[in-house]
Amino acid sequence: PKFGVVESADQAVELSRELGFPLLVRPSYVLGGQRMKIVISEEDLERHVVDILRDMPDNKILLDHFLDGAMECEADAICDGDEVRIVGIMQHIEPAGIHSGDSYAVLPPYNLGDLVIQKIEEYTKRIALALKTVGLINIQFAVKDDEVYIIEANPRASRTVPFIAKSYGEPYVNHAAKVMLGAAKLKELPHDPHMDGYAVKIPVFSYEKFPNVNKELGPEMKSTGEAIRFIPDLRDPFFRKVYSARNLYLSK
């Protein structure tokens, strides 16, 4: 999506008139979606930017045009500098705008078309090579009207790697470590993923320990862990229940 970088509230308001609302506002160099927020007006934008700069002076702030109603997906891959091996593509159940750590996600994707999957694979390989990645990389995508948009790329191990490795029964962290140490190239490492049906990533929340936390989900992460559930197919009652409630906690 269209984006820009600002260092003051005045710059943010000026850029917002070019990008258009709604906007995703996020400070640089944070984890877990800290201080990220979706804003829908100049007043909301100015207030949030001032709050960020008060607590994080001299930090750059990223503004992205928010794709309302988009699906979110992510791909994990290993790159050895010459070759890229995509180890998993996951599709979130909640719409884009919910932090990836707070979303239910399904491996492999449950309703992405072949064209969209091909684009995700192509973009993942091109980005991994362009960044000169040696090891693991995680890339998050938003999909709307069969167009694939890049949200962010993180050339590191993501929280999804253990989930994918357990789902497919493959030692991906071990493979990535060998690649990073220069002990092996991808073509020298075995790759035989297998899974019957689908694996569902289930976010775990600790609201009973933090009763005063706002339970509305958004771009700032609130989960404290995750679990895994295997289902035979998409007719499974658990998947149907989660899918039917995918918009339940999405804040206005």
Annotated model-derived regions:
Residues 21-22, 31-34, 39-252:
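ATP-dependent carboxylate activation and anion-phosphoryl transfer catalytic cores
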Residues 1-35:
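A conserved helix-loop-beta module that forms one wall/lid of the active-site cleft
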